[in-house]
Amino acid sequence: MDAAFVITPMGVLTITDTLYDDLDISIMDFIGPYIIGNIKTVQIDVRDIKYSDMQKCYFSYKGKIVPQDSNDLARFNIYSICAAYRSKNTIIIACDYDIMLDIEDKHQPFYLFPSIDVFNATIIEAYNLYTAGDYHLIINPSDNLKMKLLFNSSFCISDGNGWIIIDGKCNSNFLS
């Protein structure tokens, strides 16, 4: 598996074979070029973290998940540990409650939502709307379009104020 960005409820990570082996990640969906995944975790008490766990752990902060030896970790202003999770062979330490996505190093005010949030949209970025690989920016979308997108998608990325990124999952009957 080549490196790619995977959006998870815990944040965004650059996935490589190593991370995929360390974390129990399952791919759930795609939104255009973005992969939507889930990390199977079990919350643990922070006091149960051992020194040996710290040698191979990950940190979640401001919408990004990085390994403990990442250069990106130096940019994190970590003041506290909010929670800790065990996943497969490692620990993930959450250092804030921010679920804002950090996609491709552009800290953006976007969050992962169920596709029902498409009904709050005034602007839609739609991938794969009419044909595979297409992209459309739609201002003031119709309710009919929103309904069709809702039925074709499971997730969307939203700023919470009306800007939605969604995948139309084009097929022969879409928008007919």
From Swiss-Prot:
Major localisation: host cell
Keyword field: Host endosome, Host-virus interaction, Inhibition of host adaptive immune response by virus, Inhibition of host MHC class II molecule presentation by virus, Signal, Viral immunoevasion
Domain of life of the source: Viruses
GO biological process: symbiont-mediated suppression of host antigen processing and presentation of peptide antigen via MHC class II
Cystine crosslinks: none
Signal peptide (from-to): 1-14
InterPro entries in UniProt: Chordopox_A35R
Compartments reported by the entry: Host endosome
Entry GO terms, CC: host cell endosome
Induction record: Expressed in the early phase of the viral replicative cycle.
Function (record text): Mildly affects the expression of MHC class II molecules on the surface of host antigen presenting cells (APCs).
Family: Belongs to the orthopoxvirus OPG163 family.
Protein name: Protein OPG163
Phylogenetic classification of the source organism: Viruses, Varidnaviria, Bamfordvirae, Nucleocytoviricota, Pokkesviricetes
